[in-house]
Design a protein with these regions (language model features):
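Feature recognizes metal-dependent phosphohydrolase scaffolds
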Residues: 2-682
């Protein structure tokens, strides 16, 4: 009897504790009751959520360093780094020839481009109908496989309104008491007969790609020298589930969109150096007319050999006039940029970049520049807008050009949309499902400890430094116009681009001036942060993970630095704790690395690294059914299939179930009045 009494006391205390918690949360639960006005509504969601927890984890796709290379990005996005082809092979196997499976995979990647080619091979109406039937049935089977990780409700929400009901029937029909072939045959036959086959094929292909990857992670550098970063951002804005970790090329564009003059000059210098300014003018509507006029006025007759843009034969041809126009603007904007760098360095002594004000270190009589303790001859000695007595002072014409450029960047509606998206979906780092994602580095000392940096009177290191960088970067865009906080944030966006201890840059200096003006290659060296030595050490990687609250079995996903595979370098560091996935999209790096980079796929069963070969063109990929996956390396295989309940999303869902159970209890206690519905079973 005594034991039973003790159990009753424990039960009463437990009930009191649960009741107290409900009472404490009553204000929140009352708000929650607006969405779930009855016990029936809350209980229904509890049941569906608990079922969702038992589904397999969705596939995550990691990409990095896109560098504006839109065609390669689109191909890897469409193919999900080989996931789509794996699903095609899994469903069709050896029953369908390899070349037919390759064609079907290409159709899924590029339905609008591939469909006309495949139809053109059909020599009769009967042959076309037969091809339609085979293709639709195969696509339905593949779509059923990729939808198996999702609830039926989720799949329905992904279906296009115009044909959603029919696709739902095709994907979820049951055949216990009727003939599957007869049922499918009737629906598919009707689709073909009514001239809707093309539309259904395209919709199925898009649905397969949507369902095959649950989450896309972009680990930085959407912008750089590639031709169309705007296309990449347009696609990402339409993606169903994406996050972004800013790279140094991204933050400088974010600063430019905020109207920061030094960031504007920096992005212009990069685009002009690679003859990509057409994208600025045509896609973002940036007016370069005033810059071109000033450039011709002051530099039109100069020797522009060191200012000629890097060109890509695949994007040519280029006329002499085109190259001259680009080179003269390249020189004008570079000198303006070097002047503005002096201003930013003066305003921010805590950046510790005082040695980078090179215009002040030029001997105007000897035509040399002092770098460190040595003097070097200048490759170009024409500085008509520079006053030797005050080299950083802006010429009146430069001031006018700068005002017009700031106005143009601020008024570019598309650029503002893209940068707002980068802020909304982006951050300096991201943690999800046991993976720590960041673009560049966690700055370290030569001894392998976290580097301590002082900003605005306080010291930061490790995670605190990354959090500080994120917060100050947001000031540059969102702080009130004209405020000191906004100016400080914009200066910091430039620091994140090239600062010696920037976690997004990870090098001692951005040697832009030296590469342009100094012949001696020893001055061009950009010393990597000690992080890039220490990340080979497993203990250091585990310490980084611990700094961010993750257990040692977690992973770091890093971008930024191309892996020179042809020299034997491995993308797997720190005993498998860190993976470098620089996407290698930038064509300039292919000769150095021997490959076109890596992507990462994390499914419910494995984490795998995908190695890519250089991508020629979308046209060739469509025509010849080319893919660029050359190798798949399994990094980890799970002992059991990872379920939604094992993920970060699962934790959120369990909290929702807990809250809904409390709401049901509050209804039962009479503390919240429910709105009863006619049709319920509770």
């Amino acid at each position: 009897m005594a034991d039973c009494g003790g159990e009753n006391v424990v039960m009463e205390e437990t009930m009191r504790t649960e009741t107290d918690e409900i009472r404490d949360n009553l204000k929140y639960l009352t708000l929650l009751s607006r969405d779930y006005p009855s016990q029936a509504a809350a209980a229904s969601d509890i049941i569906s959520t608990q079922a969702l927890l038992k589904l397999p984890k969705g596939t995550e796709h990691f990409m990095s360093d896109l560098h504006g290379e839109n065609e390669a990005f689109v191909h890897i996005l469409n193919s999900a780094s080989g996931v789509i082809r794996e699903k095609v092979d899994q469903v069709l196997g050896d029953t369908v020839p390899k070349h037919t499976r390759a064609e079907l995979a290409t159709l899924i990647y590029y339905p609008n481009e591939k469909l006309p080619q495949l139809k053109a091979r059909c020599t009769s109406e009967e042959a076309l109908d037969q091809w339609y039937t085979e293709t639709l049935l195969r696509l339905i089977d593949i779509c059923r496989l990729v939808s198996s990780k999702h609830t039926r409700d989720h799949v329905r929400r992904c279906l296009p309104a115009s044909c959603g009901y029919i696709l739902d029937e095709l994907l979820h029909a049951h055949f216990e008491d009727h003939d599957k072939d007869l049922y499918y045959g009737q629906i598919v036959g009707s689709i073909i007969e009514n001239g809707r086959a093309d539309r259904f094929i395209v919709r199925l292909c898009e649905l397969i790609k949507h369902l095959a990857v649950d989450k896309l992670h972009i680990v930085g550098d959407l912008f750089d020298r590639g031709p169309r970063p705007d296309i990449i951002l347009d696609l990402l804005m339409r993606h169903h589930n994406v996050d972004i970790q800013w790279g140094n090329h991204d933050v400088v564009w974010m600063g430019a969109a905020a109207g920061n003059p030094i960031c504007i000059c920096t992005v212009l210098k990069t685009t002009l150096a690679y003859h990509n300014h057409g994208m600025l003018e045509d896609c973002y509507g940036i007016n370069l007319r005033h810059l071109q006029r000033m450039a011709e006025q002051f530099y039109g007759n100069d020797d522009l050999s060191i200012w000629m843009p890097h060109t890509d034969a695949a994007r040519g041809p280029y006329t002499r006039g085109m190259l001259h126009r680009c080179a003269v603007m390249h020189k004008a904007i570079s000198i303006l940029m070097f002047k503005l760098e002096c201003h930013v360095i003066d305003r921010n002594p805590d950046f510790q970049m005082q040695e980078r004000d090179y215009l002040r270190r030029i001997d105007w009589e000897k035509h040399t520049v002092k770098i460190g303790e040595k003097e070097y001859p200048l490759r170009d000695t024409s500085f008509p807008t520079v006053d030797p007595a005050d080299p950083a002072a802006l010429h009146p014409d430069e001031q006018l050009v700068l005002r017009k450029l700031v106005q143009s960047f601020r008024q570019s509606e598309k650029l503002q949309q893209h940068v707002e998206f980068l802020y909304a979906k982006g951050s300096v780092y991201h943690i999800e499902n046991g993976n720590l994602l960041y673009h560049g580095a966690v700055p370290m000392t030569s001894r392998g400890t976290f580097a301590m940096e002082r900003f605005e009177g306080r010291y930061y290191s490790g995670r605190a430094l990354m959090d500080y960088c994120d917060a100050r970067a947001r000031r540059g865009y969102y702080a009130p116009e004209g405020s000191a906080a906004r100016q400080s944030g914009q200066d910091f966006l430039w620091y994140l681009w090239c600062g010696k201890l920037s976690p997004l840059f990870g090098r001692s200096a951005m040697t832009t001036f030296e590469r342009l003006y100094v012949e001696d290659a020893s001055t061009h060296t950009e010393v990597k942060d000690p992080y890039y030595t220490w990340y080979n050490d497993e203990a250091v990687c585990r310490r980084i993970l611990a700094e961010f609250g993750l257990p040692g079995a977690s992973h770091i996903v890093n971008g930024h630095v191309p892996v020179r595979e042809k020299n034997g370098e491995s993308p797997i560091k720190g005993g498998g704790r860190l993976v470098v996935i620089d996407g290698g999209f930038c064509r300039a790096y292919h000769e150095k690395t021997g490959i076109a980079g890596y992507t990462l796929v994390y499914s419910s069963r494995t984490m795998s690294l995908r190695t890519h070969q250089p991508f020629e063109s979308a046209e060739k990929a469509v025509k010849d059914n080319l893919d660029i996956i050359s190798q798949k390396n399994i990094l980890e295989t799970e002992n059991h299939r990872i379920l939604v309940e094992d993920t970060d999303e699962g934790e959120v869902l369990r909290e929702r179930v807990h809250d809904l159970k409390q709401l049901v209890a509050a209804y039962q206690l009479g503390w919240i009045t429910e709105t009863r519905c006619e049709d319920h079973i509770w």
